[in-house]
Amino acid sequence: MRTSQYLLATLKEAPKNCKAISHQLMLRAGLIRQVSSGLYTWLPTGLRVLRKIENIIREEMSKIGAIEIAMPIVQPARLWKKSGRWTGYGTELLRFKNRNNQEFVLGPTHEEMVSEIICKETMLYKQFPLIVYQIHTKYRDEARPRSGVIRAREFIMKDGYSFHINQKSLQNTYNNMYQTYHTIFNRIGLNFCVVQAEPGKIGGALSHEFQAYSENGEDSIAVPMIPDNNLIDFQLSNDVIPIKIQPKTAVETMQLIAAPNIRSVEELINQFNLPIHQFVKTIIVRAKNKHINNDYSLLGLVIRADHQISLKKIAMIPQIHIPLSCIEPEEIQKITGAQPNLLGPINLSIPLIIDYNVAKMNDFVAGSNMSGKYFFGVNWNRDILFSKVADLHEVLHHNSYTNKKNILSIHNCIEIGHIFQLGQKYLNLHTNYSQKNNEHKHNLSMEMGCYGIGITRIIAVIIEQNYDKNGILWPDVIAPFKLAIIPIDMYRSVNVRNIAEKIYTQLLSVIGIDILIDDRKEYPGTMFADIDLIGIPHILIISDRSLANQEVEYKYRKKNKIEKIKLEMLIRYLIEKIVSS
């Protein structure tokens, strides 16, 4: 491809209202242009990246026997009314009527439609399991689109659906899809983790989210501090799983309220008529390390008021002195000047370790470390920051876990994929399925799974994880072009022009890769800046100066280091560099 025939569409500066670095670079590098709030046109450079990601997904889906289909984005309202999501999905579901006054929706997802399609087909039990998927445009009427394509109204998803004759078959496909998602995201070059999640508006019994690390992420994940291990398998390592931290939106303003006669949490609960789980308590313990004077330093442990500290879990935290040693009330008064029941995490002059259940709370009540006063309406990030989260509380229900790698670190993340076990939630909506099930001699009891990947969002996430001051640093496998050729002053130098054209033609025929030759009449600085900005990983620079020594210059974008390559060795060198990457 020649830049003279290409819509490069680069910008020197991003619009001032763009806050996310991915949004800025996608606009500056000419990947997208905004049409309206939450709506974007994909320009040629962005579309090339998009198609490469889609093809990787198609390759991996094909390996597990998934079949591609295409369903309409416009769906009849009757399907959504039957499932209950016509009202249950909320205002993000865009509803409209056609000229015949019939109701429709723009589909944010396709569970209702695909389940009806499969249930209408006359299929034998031997044809199951069946996996279908599509790569298609979706629409979600976001109240406040933001961060470019990370939170857009229109987006492209891979949504897959599987159908099974029993739960065991569903579990097998679920496990295969789980591993396939690992493969896809690893091939793309993402740094991510997996968390067990709530099914949300889609529903079902079991679901897992794939979360990519990003400073601009809207989700918070507490991840066990395990070096070089960003991939946690929920089956093989149930004791070491990331935890999704989702503090609820703050409703109240923090207030300091006097309660001079209160001497316990129970009295506070009774006076203010609030549930006990809305209160936190702070316990000061001795740390493992000592001061110069041989006294132990101190730590504050913060848990819900209705929870107890787990001695078993505490023993796994290396910062805490074992056996556990809580300080006496007299020492607490020396530190805070207040009674133990008034201890709280705000303005406490010692390090804190916070139970992950507390990290998810909003508008909670805590001691103020001041005599006779409590903070009401406390919220994380607004009123107090947390840096260290751990699993501290005693297990009181059967499905909790003990995390052997107990200290957790908090990361902002963006959801890039989600898989669900739906069971029979959508299949039971269809009368013909129920009739077939009752009449079938094999007593078919179909189960359903669904599996999504946010493709357009992934591009933004990759940029969030791969950029420098000059632009995007694409992983080779999804770069819009593998190689850029920059001929310096090619319109003044016949030699430069001829060599550049010869190399371009040879590489196209020998290697067959995507190449962009910059044949514009531009200053070299502009050409270098544009190629770096759009993130082409391999760059050839051809000039009279280098050709005088029968050489060209090669730069690998991520290392930004120039190498001189002899012309006779160039093709072999590039094959080794590019094809093997």
Swiss-Prot record:
Nucleotide-binding listed as a keyword: yes
Pfam families listed in its UniProt record:
HGTP_anticodon, tRNA-synt_2b, tRNA_edit
- What EC number(s) does the entry state? 6.1.1.15
Q: Does the keyword Protein biosynthesis apply?
A: yes
Q: Which principal EC class is assigned to this enzyme?
A: ligase
Subcellular location(s) per record = Cytoplasm
Q: In Gene Ontology terms, what is a biological process of this protein? A: prolyl-tRNA aminoacylation
Task: Enumerate the catalysed reactions.
Answer: tRNA(Pro) + L-proline + ATP = L-prolyl-tRNA(Pro) + AMP + diphosphate
Q: Which NCBIfam families match?
A: PRK09194.1, proS_fam_II
According to its UniProt entry, what is the function of this protein? Answer: Catalyzes the attachment of proline to tRNA(Pro) in a two-step reaction: proline is first activated by ATP to form Pro-AMP and then transferred to the acceptor end of tRNA(Pro). As ProRS can inadvertently accommodate and process non-cognate amino acids such as alanine and cysteine, to avoid such errors it has two additional distinct editing activities against alanine. One activity is designated as 'pretransfer' editing and involves the tRNA(Pro)-independent hydrolysis of activated Ala-AMP.
What remark about domains does the record contain?
Consists of three domains: the N-terminal catalytic domain, the editing domain and the C-terminal anticodon-binding domain.
What is the protein's given name? Proline--tRNA ligase
* Source organism per UniProt: Blochmanniella pennsylvanica (strain BPEN)
From the UniProt record, report the name of the gene that encodes this protein. proS
